[in-house]
Amino acid sequence: MKKHPLHMLGRLVAGKNTQWITLSVWILITLLLSFTLPQVNSTKEPNPKNLPETAMSQQAEALMKKEFPNNAGNPLLVVWYRDGGLQSQDYKLIQDVYKELKASPLKEQSTLPPFDTIPEQVLSKSASKDGTSFVTPVFFNKSAGTDILKENLDDLRNIVNSKVDEDPFKRKINDAGLHVRLSGPVGIQTDAVSLFSQADVKLLVATVLLVLVLLILLYRSPILAILPLLVVGFAYGIISPTLGFLADHGWIKVDAQAISIMTVLLFGAGTDYCLFLISRYREYLLEEESKYKALQLAIKASGGAIIMSALTVVLGLGTLLLAHYGAFHRFAVPFSVAVFIMGIAALTILPAFLLIFGRTAFFPFIPRTTSMNEELARRKKKVVKVKKSKGAFSKKLGDVVVRRPWTIIMLTVFVLGGLASFVPRIQYTYDLLESFPKDMPSREGFTLISDHFSAGELAPVKVIVDTKGKELPIKEELEKFSFVNTVKDPKEGKENKQIQMYEVSLAENPYSIEALDQIPKLKNSVEKVFKDAGISNAEDQLWIGGETASLYDTKQITERDEAVIIPVMISIIALLLLVYLRSIVAMIYLIVTVVLSFFSALGAGWLLLHYGMGAPAIQGAIPLYAFVFLVALGEDYNIFMVSEIWKNRKTQNHLDAVKNGVIQTGSVITSAGLILAGTFAVLGTLPIQVLVQFGIVTAIGVLLDTFIVRPLLVPAITVVLGRFAFWPGKLSRKSEEVQKVDA
């Protein structure tokens, strides 16, 4: 008789003395990879591109570098601000600072405007209309790395501070006196990298502590609380150099944001997989005296669900490879590799640790068989204690589910549907600067510029055209729009004089959704000019660039990725469920319930973020991030519980199979859900809004799955469908006596 593959796996990893071999292999591989390959943190790209080269704004940027080159370098914008108006001493300070920068340039300084020689009266004319703000640039070499730039900015701060009594960089904006902020591309870049580097350490420490505390509270065993963390640690010891190797060879690209979220996913999902096996192991320890036999049975019983859950997440997250938006695409491989290795760790090194510690791993609540308890009581000359039945709440829940399935379905759908109804009201933003803390120096400087200077002049739209040698009324056409403030006279290309660039200042905030919506109007109006002039293929003679155009492309590409990835991911997970459960009906309602849970989480997240935390909008990337994680991880819990119902149905009638499935998986899935939600909630403590928003929405979604979808909605639907829940599998043809189900 052919043995089950999971039975063979159990014999392999949970045989006598194999635990030491398994542990030795893991230690050897971890040490070998750690000392021979780079760690993933050393291969992160500080400023990876998100838009593809085919995007119109990126084509415009490439053309501008060729035809309208700016050899000055990367700009740092030094913002000088004093409420009530800049004073003579402030302009004198600016002159002195630039005089010193001219005499002793910063290491990577490339170009410096001559502010040291410009009279105060002339300088003051370039200040904001209210006289409170003045912006001076310092240009740096484009090849300069972030670390070197950070040192240069520190040197600049020291120069300014050496000429004043009180540090103007640390003075709060609302306080009296001179304020200086470093903004622009260089200031934002250095602040962002510093922010993410601080977030990495904070995130790791907070996640480890949270998981440890939750495990101790839930299982009341110090050893059991540490084991999942050890397993995750070993998994990370292989994941980090593996990803570092792939990134070092240019096969993948990784960024700080992806690594931060991967850390959370690893601890959350990894701990869940460990708990699935540990809970089964504990059950079998109550029946089997041999820890080896108990663990082999546990691996056979839970291994399929763990493998299926990990495979669902791996393939689900792998669909992000289809994304054109860089931030999405960079998530795919690191996350899939991390979960794949974590799944292997849960079924190999975790059993090794469980065998090494044996029953002691559950100390002080050690699980023993009845005969072992009797023997222990005899030796201690005590009466055998009759253990109270655990899981009373799960039993009541199971009873309610099978007795009142329609009531539960209507109530849960009403709650989830009510939350989902807020999704159409969500406002989105694609301005990444809004994702950073309001008190981040470069953002404060940027806010000062936008508040005291024309918003449109801050980031003009660059309209570039190939006139084909014709006189075209493009400027006049662009000036007709009410949302256009000014249009500068065109500049001619350096190499091709027929190429012209118009700088268009918008009347509204160039980073707003309203401004993004004007880009197609500008494009259509210029194409009309081409058409009227008899120039064919107008779309090939026109490029629109600048920050507003880049954000417009971001919006378009993000929406394209959602339209492609969501149906592909649903199809892949549906196929996996069909293969695993052999039921078309179950596949459909499991997918539908998780998708409903996603929309509910998005609606609930908006309620909390907008009305509770005052966020005017959420980042446009959040829906796809949340969908991919919630659908993949949400199916984990469904798979674990439904596989238990399917197993029970082989020996029990339908209602008992569902009821016992809820009871048997209740505590472990609740524990796993709390831990996973907790780890994502840790993201909410970070100063980076895109991570805060993602963490909150995902944590809410996990909680909805844990406490509503998994224990109530899914089993209630299974009860109502009866044997059709298994159709067309063999279980759908299994006969049973009819049992009454109350509506």
UniProtKB/Swiss-Prot annotation:
One Pfam family per UniProt: MMPL
Disruption phenotype: Deletion of the gene abrogates export of intact petrobactin, which accumulates inside the cell. However, growth of the mutants in iron-depleted medium is not affected, and virulence in mice is not attenuated.
Alphabetical keyword list: Cell membrane, Membrane, Transmembrane, Transmembrane helix, Transport
InterPro entries: MMPL_dom, Mycobact_MmpL, SSD
Name under which the protein is recorded: Apo-petrobactin exporter
Localisation per UniProt entry: Cell membrane
PROSITE patterns, per the entry: SSD (PS50156)
Domain of life of the source: Bacteria
Annotated membrane topology: Multi-pass membrane protein
Keyword DNA-binding carried by entry: no
Main location group: membrane
Similarity-based family: Belongs to the resistance-nodulation-cell division (RND) (TC 2.A.6) family. MmpL subfamily.
Transmembrane segments: 20-40, 199-219, 223-243, 258-278, 303-323, 337-357, 406-426, 561-581, 584-604, 613-633, 672-692, 694-714
Function: Exports the siderophore petrobactin.
Cellular component, GO, one term: plasma membrane
Species annotation: Bacillus anthracis
Keyword Membrane: yes
